[in-house]
């Protein structure tokens, strides 16, 4: 039986809730990890949504706060943390060998990218994250996206490549 050691958050923001805490209830020894810029999102939302004064904005709700370009070991796996701000200032992509998990930074090429109209989102940062931090990866790098909205009613897809993104991403 496999036991997860880490639960990775690519980002957090106000339009959806994370399932990480539910997973943590089932696997209490697993660490929840997120990029250390999460405090920027927490500060923004604390002000924007008038959260209680004592709401912590230091990322203390998470077990691990990752640094950009940090190499992390989890059991026999190793991954790289790549900050990819834009959708939120704290968006993070995780690279495992020849695969990346982008959250809302990139979607399938026929849908484009995540929104950047949330508080503290930035179209310029999102563009730079994709073109300078992800498009420098080999074209054959597998990309696992955070959502697939199935434009035109096509079948669900969740995997593409950096090469496909470069050639066909509509954004």
Task: Annotate each PLM feature.
Residues 2-77, 167:
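Active-site HxH/HxHxD metal-binding segment of metal-dependent hydrolases
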Residues 44, 51, 78-83, 88-171:
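Metallo-beta-lactamase
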């Amino acid at each position: 039986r496999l036991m997860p050691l880490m639960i990775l958050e690519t980002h957090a923001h106000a339009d959806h809730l994370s399932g990480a805490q539910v997973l943590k209830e089932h696997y209490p020894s697993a660490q929840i990890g997120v990029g250390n810029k999460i405090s920027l999102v927490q500060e923004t939302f604390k002000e924007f949504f008038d959260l209680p004064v004592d709401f912590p904005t230091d990322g203390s709700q998470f077990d691990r706060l990752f640094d950009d370009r940090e190499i992390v070991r989890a059991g026999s796996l190793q991954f790289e943390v790549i900050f990819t701000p834009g959708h939120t200032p704290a968006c993070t992509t995780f690279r495992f060998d020849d695969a990346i998990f982008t959250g809302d930074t990139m979607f399938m090429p026929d849908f484009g990218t995540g929104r950047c109209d949330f508080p503290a989102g930035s179209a310029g940062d999102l563009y730079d994250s994709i073109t300078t931090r992800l498009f420098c990866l080999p074209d054959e790098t597998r990309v696992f996206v955070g959502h697939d909205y199935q434009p035109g009613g096509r079948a669900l897809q969740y995997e593409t490549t950096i090469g496909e993104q470069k050639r066909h991403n509509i954004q």
